[in-house]
């Protein structure tokens, strides 16, 4: 799939809606983030059924589809355990979803959903959502290859680690300890001096 006029916006829900549908974010009801949805044209936070997502189109053509990670394309008042579920990933063409519905979540104790069911992350001090998603994504691909090796697949991968809260394990943060203590300006000067 290749887009010829795609652009990002400064906020995530609109960009995700455009990426998923191949259409302008306001034309698909996502002129702002899902939590700020209002009853104005282009700002409802609802991707209309008349605007199919890539997953819906590809599933129609025989693909198996899965989404992992951050969704953030459902109005907040519709993300409870009671649904409605038609605006969750499985209602937008994904056969499988594992991730979180909101704009951000803890990377160590995330509020996770598998398809339409809330699930608890493992209670393990070494747990991190990015690693969990990678393991589950690889597992999904292995199952797909085992059960339907000739069937095409589409995996939507949307990690949440770039969003707050910024939580990284010590094995990663330790590599940068002391490198930025002089401040942004000093670092910038060193970079531009190279």
Model-found features: residue ranges?
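Formylglycine-dependent sulfatase
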Residues: 1-194
């Amino acid at each position: 799939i290749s887009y010829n006029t795609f652009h990002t916006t400064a906020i995530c829900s609109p960009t995700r809606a455009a990426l998923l549908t191949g259409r302008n974010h306001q034309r698909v009801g996502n002129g702002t983030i899902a939590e700020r949805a209002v009853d104005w044209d282009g700002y409802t936070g609802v991707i209309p059924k008349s605007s199919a997502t890539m997953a819906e189109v590809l599933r129609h053509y025989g693909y198996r589809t899965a989404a992992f990670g951050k969704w953030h394309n459902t109005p907040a008042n519709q993300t409870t355990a009671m649904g409605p579920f038609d605006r969750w990933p499985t209602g937008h063409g994904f056969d499988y979803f594992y991730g979180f519905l909101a704009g951000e979540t803890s990377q160590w104790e995330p509020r996770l959903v598998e398809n339409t069911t809330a699930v608890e992350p493992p209670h393990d001090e070494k747990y991190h959502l990015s690693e969990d998603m990678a393991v589950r994504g690889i597992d999904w691909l292995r199952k797909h290859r085992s059960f339907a090796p000739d069937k095409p697949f589409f995996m939507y991968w949307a990690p949440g680690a770039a969003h707050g809260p910024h939580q990284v394990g010590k094995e990663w943060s330790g590599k940068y300890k002391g490198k930025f203590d002089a401040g942004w300006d000093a670092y910038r000067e060193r970079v531009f001096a190279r």
